[in-house]
C-alpha cells in the first residue's frame, strides 16, 4: 500500500514512529525537518479523516432520528 493509500491506523502508527524518531537526539537536522513535514502531512490527513467520519456518524444519527419521527407519524 502506498503512503497515499494508507489506512487511518497505518497513518497513526507512522505518526507515532515519527514522534519517537524526533525524540531521538541522534537524528540529524535535515532528517528532523523531513520527519516533521511528513508528520504534519499525516496529522492533517488523520484530522480530515476523523472529521469526515464524525460527519458521517452525525448524518446517520440524524437519519435515524428522522426515520423514528416519520415512523411515529405514520403510526399515529
From Swiss-Prot:
Heterooligomer composed of large and small subunits. Belongs to the XseB family. The gene is xseB. Its main location: cytoplasm. It is an enzyme of class 3 (hydrolase). This is Exodeoxyribonuclease 7 small subunit. InterPro entries: Exonuc_VII_S, Exonuc_VII_ssu_sf. HAMAP family: Exonuc_7_S. Pfam families: Exonuc_VII_S (PF02609). It catalyses: Exonucleolytic cleavage in either 5'- to 3'- or 3'- to 5'-direction to yield nucleoside 5'-phosphates. Keywords: Cytoplasm, Exonuclease, Hydrolase, Nuclease. One of its GO terms (cellular component) is exodeoxyribonuclease VII complex. Gene3D superfamilies: Exonuclease VII, small subunit. Its EC number is 3.1.11.6. GO terms for molecular function: exodeoxyribonuclease VII activity. GO terms for biological process: DNA catabolic process. It comes from Staphylococcus haemolyticus (strain JCSC1435). It comes from the Bacteria. It is found in: Cytoplasm. Bidirectionally degrades single-stranded DNA into large acid-insoluble oligonucleotides, which are then degraded further into small acid-soluble oligonucleotides.
